Amino acid sequence: MPVRKAVVTWTGARDGAGEVRLGSATQGLRYTWASRFEEEVGSNPEELLAGALASCFAMALASRLTRNNAPPKTLTATAEATVEKVEGEWTITGVALHLRGDVPGMSLAELTPHAEAAKAGCPVSRALKAVPITLVVEE
């Protein structure tokens, strides 16, 4: 099985900056305390986690639908990770997944159980079992 890698270099104290280099990317992503907990431009770990969940979920759902003879035309998954202080420590308290899907011949009511199953079974969701993940399937 493949092993995926990310390398992080942090320079300086809390007001320093870091760079995340993903194994397959040609450029790193800059992140800082302010891009994480304030409104500064830059990436942050929660955004990367949300992206990992949304992409894993979309791939799992596309695979599931294809196996059920309903290949999707497009799936757009959005994930929003919420980070809050819990007992004085920053904690990811939930992730909200939103799905818009164009699946020819499939209604929203028919798509929703497939989306729920993909959410429960994708590897990133399984790794995040301690975090509540909600799913809204939209028209």
Model-inferred region functions:
Residues 1-51, 58-139:
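Extended beta-strand/beta-hairpin segments
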